[in-house]
């Protein structure tokens, strides 16, 4: 299953027009993303507010991630304070996968961002979280927090933004988007055989491991006849015919 490093802003010193700050709202978006990530089977690690950008980069580079995803909001230059608007998603020049992810994210953000200009994807050499990460990287600037309309949009749209970004991640990784549901527990009933945990909801997909008959699993979501499950820290799809909810 896909595995991302989720890096919401730790910049509490960036105030929002109308109250709050960048660290607060970006971490609220990350919090709201977590149930969607789990239901979709996207594994993740996350920074914490005590870390700085260099530490987030180091933590990302210490793992094997399929995407580094940074969550931020923007600020206008002093001479244009409060005047600029719109989402921008950055990637590093030459990072083809980072570019692909950023374009998908920008296109989907344009569907929910209510003002002009629409979201766009741009390359940059000035952001370490795209130029210094081992994994492909996208750095989202959701909107301008010094603009009264943009700041209010972020503040009022936490859940909508979180869902939209995870839809983009599912599109990027080529997996189904699954709305969160209450986490359940199931018991495997496979007549003595091991039940495969697969990377896609298909019997043709690669098996990441097996669940022994009688074992219990955590169920995060469902698409068709497949559950998104976790067993022994392995996350993937398992055939629902062989799992009984308990």
Where are these regions (language model features)?
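Active-site histidine-acidic residue metal-binding/catalytic motifs
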Residues: 1-57, 63, 85
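Structural recognition of the beta-strand scaffold that forms the well-ordered cores
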Residues: 3-8, 43-46, 66-71, 88-91, ...
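Active-site-adjacent mobile loop/cap segments within catalytic or ligand-binding domains
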Residues: 4-14, 63, 68-77, 121-179
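A short, glycine/acidic-enriched catalytic loop
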Residues: 13-24, 75-104
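Long, well-ordered alpha-helical scaffolding segments within enzyme catalytic domains
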Residues: 28-39, 96-114, 151-180
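SH3-family beta-barrel domains
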Residues: 178-196, 209-213, 221-223, 244-246
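SH3/SH3-like beta-barrel fold
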Residues: 214, 227-231
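Boundary regions of SH3-family modules and the immediately adjacent low-complexity/disordered segments
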Residues: 230-246
């Amino acid at each position: 299953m896909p595995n991302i490093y989720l890096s919401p802003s730790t910049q509490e010193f960036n105030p929002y027009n109308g109250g709050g700050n960048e660290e607060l709202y970006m971490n609220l978006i990350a919090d709201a993303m977590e149930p969607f990530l789990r239901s979709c089977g996207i594994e993740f690690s996350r920074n914490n507010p005590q870390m700085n950008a260099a530490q987030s980069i180091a933590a990302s580079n210490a793992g094997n991630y399929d995407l580094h995803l940074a969550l931020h909001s923007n600020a206008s230059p002093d001479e244009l304070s409060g005047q600029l608007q719109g989402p921008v998603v950055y990637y590093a020049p030459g990072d083809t996968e980072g570019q692909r992810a950023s374009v998908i994210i920008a296109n989907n953000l344009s569907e929910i961002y209510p003002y002009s200009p629409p979201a766009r994807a741009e390359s940059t050499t000035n952001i370490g979280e795209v130029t210094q990460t081992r994994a492909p990287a996208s750095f989202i600037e959701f909107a301008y927090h010094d603009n009264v309309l943009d700041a209010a949009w972020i503040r009022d749209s936490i859940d909508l933004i979180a869902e939209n970004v995870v839809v983009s991640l599912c599109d990027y990784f080529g997996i189904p988007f699954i709305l969160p549901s209450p986490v359940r527990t199931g018991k495997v009933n496979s007549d003595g055989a091991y039940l495969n945990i697969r990377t896609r909801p298909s019997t043709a997909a690669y098996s990441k491991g097996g669940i022994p008959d009688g074992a219990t699993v955590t169920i995060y979501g469902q698409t068709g006849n497949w559950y998104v499950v976790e067993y022994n820290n392995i996350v993937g799809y398992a055939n629902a015919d062989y799992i009984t909810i308990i």
